[in-house]
Amino acid sequence: LLYEQILRLFPKNRDSIKSLITSLVKQGRIIHDKENDLLCDTAESASNPDYGMIAAFWVLLDFKKAVVYHTNGDFPIKLNFFSKDEWYEILYIPLEQEYLINHVMESQSADQVKRLVVLENEGQARKVTIDNVVAFCLVDTTSGVVSYYTKK
């Protein structure tokens, strides 16, 4: 994740979180790639960041005040979170992977879940046939600004 994402997760404790991050880096428990401003668990993840997870986490941060619990998901779901009585999945669809993700999601139960789908560009939405999509998301991964829209 990006350093700024972790700080935004704990906005009232920014200084404490910065100290904790510094301590974890000194202990070798996490890696801070200062050039890309990434916090990673391994050198391998620092050299090959999961930009889909970074984008999905920006979406999660938009819902932060309402989130009761969150966890990672299984491919192609990046994150799951619960808000009140609602269950959400955040998916990330890279360019040219729309049909693959559609196929994988056909076997996934969609009875009670609401899906937020992060795309690389707006044109991908017309190729997505996943059930229970409540919004498509475009994420500026640098600023964290998320734009939400629905398919017409």
Question: Whereabouts are the PLM-identified features?
Answer:
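Short acidic, hydrophobic short linear motifs in intrinsically disordered regions
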Residues: L1-F10
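Hydrophobic beta-strand segments of well-ordered beta-sheets in folded domains
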Residues: D85-Y92, A110-E120, V134-F136
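A short acidic, amphipathic alpha-helical/loop segment
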Residues: L20, L100-S107, V128-T129
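Domain-level recognition of nuclease-like catalytic cores that cleave nucleotide substrates
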Residues: G123-K152
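Nucleic-acid-binding surface
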Residues: L1-L2, R29-M105
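Short phosphate-engaging motifs
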Residues: L2, S16, Q124
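Short amphipathic alpha-helical interaction segments
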Residues: P11-K26
